[in-house]
Amino acid sequence: LLVFDEETLRTMCRQFVGEFTSRYSNSFVAYASKAFLNQAIARLVAEEGLGLDVVSGGELAVAKAAGVPMDKLYFHGNNKSPEELEFAVESGIGRVVVDSFHEMGLLSDIARARGVIQDVMIRLSPNVDPHTHAHTTTGILDSKFGFSIETGDAARAIRRALDAPNLDLVGIHFHLGSPIFELEPYSIAIDTV
């Protein structure tokens, strides 16, 4: 049995949205579904103005069943199956965060077959050590996540996305790892990106 205090969750959501939008008016806060997701949580965060960050077809299905607007979803993950990408495009997902050239090709083919233009973001690997546990470090050169800036893959991925007629490159993304207790790795990564 899991018990959540709804008012506390709503207050936290409002605080996150309020803090970000008060400083950056064009901010968009997304709840990381991997933390915990069921239909009630999905509805609650959507009602409070947050989007959802989903990493699987299952999380996407929960969000869809909960009535979360699909344009408020970001689909992350470095191992999306063709079926999950098809489901995402078919569902009208807001953005797919692309992690590999293979995924970009699959997504482009699916969007073309459906006659849609899919918004995408490119996940970059800035090769920054966040000084955390090796198993949770995701933004270094040999990471399995994203396109390396240092090797030129990031520039090639951006060019390929811009050239794909059924993909609309709307942004870039990076993640360094967790937990991170220092600001310096973020500052270095932002300068690198």
Residue ranges and their predicted role:
Residues 1-119, 155, 159, 164-169, ...:
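A charged N-terminal "starter" segment
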Residues 32, 119-125, 173-175:
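Short beta-strand segments
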Residues 127-193:
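Active-site loop/helix belt of alpha/beta enzymes
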